[in-house]
Amino acid sequence: AREAVEKLLEMIPAGSSVTWGGSMSIRDIDIPAALANAGKYKVYDRDKAPDRAAATEIYLKAFSCDYYLSSANAITEDGVIVNIDGTGNRVAAITFGPRNVIFVIGMNKLTQNVDAALARARSLAAPVNTARFDIQTPCKLDGVCHNCLSDDCICNYIHYLRHSPKGKHKVILVGECLGY
């Protein structure tokens, strides 16, 4: 994981503005601390926002950042990146806005195909995230996707990145388990 953080820091030029989504993979390997400690980036960290309004401003800055960092719920053997999202902030930033998007993805998220990737996202990542955020959905109760339409559903947006505009998206595959 240390090598992944070093590679990430090499990929981001000094003076760049950087933010990230609510990724456990990003947190698992202490990327926010590495960026802050490097002292050469303009870092927007919503976790350090003093209140909800300030956090919302950081969400919006993601669209004009030089670099947006994310993980994925799954990546297929042929490179399709799959994400689900409740509010859309992550998939929106991955799709539009930031000049560059770097994915940091653990090998535990590698799946054979898109169907397996979506199943992984909905049946493994979503129930764990609903528990993490204490969201009251059926999958939180039993760990099984019910394809719910609850007001608290975190699977409102399903995003497949199958081809990237030249140079916008980059992937760092980490040879260990990261996130869920």
Question: Predicted regions: what is each one?
Answer:
Residues A1-Y59, S64-L69:
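N-terminal active-site beta-alpha-beta segment that forms phosphate/nucleotide-binding
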